[in-house]
Amino acid sequence: MADLSPVIQPHREGGSRYGYTMFPGLESEAELSLSLASTKTRSYGSTGSVAAPLAERYIEHCLSPSDTLQGIALKYGVTMEQIKRANKLFSTDCIFLRKSLNIPVISKKGSLFNGLGSLDSPENETQDTCSSPTEEPALAESHTVSIDSSAKTNQPIVRSDEELSAKDFLQRLDLQIKRSTQAAQRLKEEDDLRHDGSYATCSYQH
């Protein structure tokens, strides 16, 4: 009597998990779907993503007695939670125990060849912005002086009406004093002449 049981053939292309397969067509489709799912699609040219990668760098801020966490966050455009997370602060009062804080700043990093190369180096990730308190007013003062000097050179000098009126008033006052002095001298000379004439007339009559 012949044996009619199905013969299990070994899989020629590497086999399945146990080395044999009952449905080679279905297994090939499953392997194909798994391979397509695990394969990362690449995009080239204009089909690539235009969104630039974001990188987080830190700026060192030197603390002063008047600094507050809210003021620092508003100055750099970040949230207080980001500053706390970057410096591992548990409360806002802990900033007075430090000399400086690391401020997280998110910046776009330029890339070459779809992310294969980066223009920014890790050495440039941290930027030191600490400066002494005496240097900041000096820089601000020099900046204002330069602005004032440039404004003076670009614009003609125009005197205000108050200065002109004060100068005119002083000139008029000097002129009035001079005229009154001349008038007083003239009156005095006329009185002297009149007195001399009356004295001469009296002496002639006698």
From Swiss-Prot:
InterPro entries (alphabetical): LYSM1-4, LysM_dom, LysM_dom_sf
Identification of the protein by name: LysM and putative peptidoglycan-binding domain-containing protein 2
Listed PROSITE patterns: LYSM (PS51782)
SMART domains: LysM
Record region (Disordered): 184-206
Disulfide bonds: none
Gene: lysmd2
Compositional bias of kind Basic and acidic residues: 186-197
Biological source species: Xenopus laevis (African clawed frog)
Boundaries of every LysM domain copy: 59-103
